[in-house]
Structure formats: C-alpha cells, structure tokens
Amino acid sequence: MAHDHNHDHEHEERELITLVDEQGNETLFEILLTIDGMEEFGKNYVLLVPANAEEDENGEVEIQAYSFTENEDGTEGDLQPIPEDAEEEWNMIEEVFNSFMEE
C-alpha cells in the first residue's frame, strides 16, 4: 500500500483501498497521498477520498486521514484514526497536503 512519495510524478493509475466500518459495510476509497512520518512520529499516514466522490457546492471533497502500519509482506495493514489533539501530526499532514495540492 505504501510507497515513497517524492511529489515529482503523476499517478497514472488510481490506488484503491476498501475500508470496512463497525457494521461490516465496505466503502471503496482512493489513496490520495501517503506520507512517511516514521522519522518524526514513528508512523506513516495515508490520505483517502471516497472513490466515487463528487465535489460539493464549494468544489471540495471530504478527505480522511489515518496513520497506518503495514504488515510484513506490505499487502495489508492497520489504519488508525489520528487523535484530534495530535496538533503536531495534523500540522505536518496539512503542510504536506498543501504542498501536494500546489503541484
């Protein structure tokens, strides 16, 4: 799922992931961006958008952010919500996302 993201290339294929909620409902998401936060926070991050999301009246789409840990073979992993009070983590994610969007 994860890859080094050096922000100097375009994705030709969409990377998709299926999330399952507490009720067992599956939702398909597109991986918008992965962020290597191992050095600073000891974990990596992923930004997701619903795969078939349409922009709202303001031209925006809901983006979800999670920290993640891959399993040893790199095919799956565990997503964890990022605590709302993790201000330094959110600041880093916002900074990387803004740089990504400027490209």
UniProtKB/Swiss-Prot annotation:
Pfam families: DUF1292 (PF06949). It comes from the Bacteria. InterPro entries: UPF0473 (IPR009711). PANTHER family: UPF0473 PROTEIN CBO2561/CLC_2432 (PTHR40066), UPF0473 PROTEIN CBO2561_CLC_2432 (PTHR40066:SF1). Belongs to the UPF0473 family. HAMAP family: UPF0473. NCBIfam families: PRK13678.1-2 (NF010215), PRK13678.1-4 (NF010217). This is UPF0473 protein SGO_2040. The lineage of its organism: Bacteria, Bacillati, Bacillota, Bacilli, Lactobacillales.
